Amino acid sequence: MAEQGSPRRFARIDRLPPYVFNITAELKMAARRRGEDIIDLSMGNPDGATPPHIVEKLVQVAQREDTHGYSTSKGIPRLRRAISNWYKERYAVDIDPESEAIVTIGSKEGLAHLMLATLDQGDTVLVPNPSYPIHIYGAVIAGAQVRSVPLVPGVDFFAELERAIRGSIPKPKMMILGFPSNPTAQCVELDFFERVIALAKQYDVLVVHDLAYADIVYDGWKAPSIMQVPGAKDIAVEFFTLSKSYNMAGWRIGFMVGNPELVNALARIKSYHDYGTFTPLQVAAIAALEGDQQCVRDIAEQYRQRRNVLVKGLHELGWMVENPKASMYVWAKIPEAYAHLGSLEFAKKLLAEAKVCVSPGVGFGEYGDDHVRFALIENQDRIRQAVRGIRGMFRADGLAPKTAG
């Protein structure tokens, strides 16, 4: 019990570090209150409208009197069948809608609840570093220990993964993967997943794959699903969210497919935690998955054009960032002249002097501290304005373009 006058302590909350992104978010809001025009390329929050046919379906179903009660925590059967059909048509994978699919309130909720359902004190989870924060802290909240696996340039990630499994005592219970990666935009081919599944089966390690950016792909490249690997469902599950593909981030709807035991575990804990997503949202999700997918291609094309503008602009400044072939992010190594600052201080500098808000790489793990992440969430004119702001900062610091990177 806390002493009188002292703050109460909550052990689970104490395990969570300060949220780095809140620091830059608060500085951004303070700057805007002062009237400064800040180009916000920080949070991966789509700025486009949800396709009209999806919105129309939501409105239509929401006007029915019989759709406003509690839904089911596993998702309505019709949506689970649509998920099954989506996998069949897209990846030639059979998913049983009754035992191998579950609807989630966005993938973030599903990931967190899956880890809460399956992990406990003493369990070890392998997570790429850097990685999307819920991949790390979902395990921490569940009480498990996280072992970071470096996902950095010049390092063979699979070899590091294999080394981590063999070197962990006790043996890891689960690995969390996400490709195309947030924040690094790193991609893998199907043969990578084949090796992962073989390794996981050899050591009996559960595999959770986050396929959030399946559709945000460029230049003819296609993102594979781990479910395409024969036997993957024996040991793996995969999450997908409608947030990015259909500009439905605020709708909070996604799904998980794969191993029936893990699907059942998630369904069981969700039956205690929630009543599922609002039924009209689920029916609208059916319209998204089963409707014309040109809208998805159009959204990806918009991101591709923004990527081109940002990468070209930074290259012209001498900041030679990688050109991603997927995701809605540019993962940029901090220019050598600023490397000593680390990602948080460099992000603060960009905000104060270039009027550009980015995500500091350290927020995704310590191995990300030499990078910042640009999210492609402003239009092309605003991205060009961001490049001009960065150019001004470089010039003020005496950096010619050729020495900026």
Model regions: which residues?
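Active-site phosphate-binding strand-loop segment of PLP-dependent enzymes
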Residues: 147, 151-220
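Helix C-cap/helix->beta junction micro-motif
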Residues: 31-34, 142, 202-203, 317, ...
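Conserved glycine-rich beta-strand-loop-beta hairpin in the small C-terminal domain of fold type I
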Residues: 286, 301-311, 321-334, 368
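Conserved core segment of the aminotransferase class I/II
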Residues: 228-229, 233-304, 308-317, 393-394
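N-terminal small-domain helix-loop-helix segment of the aminotransferase-like
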Residues: 2-106, 113, 288-291, 397-399, ...
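Conserved PLP-anchoring active-site segment centered on the Schiff-base-forming lysine
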Residues: 117-139
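PLP-dependent enzyme catalytic core of the Aspartate aminotransferase-like
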Residues: 93, 339-342, 349-359, 363-405
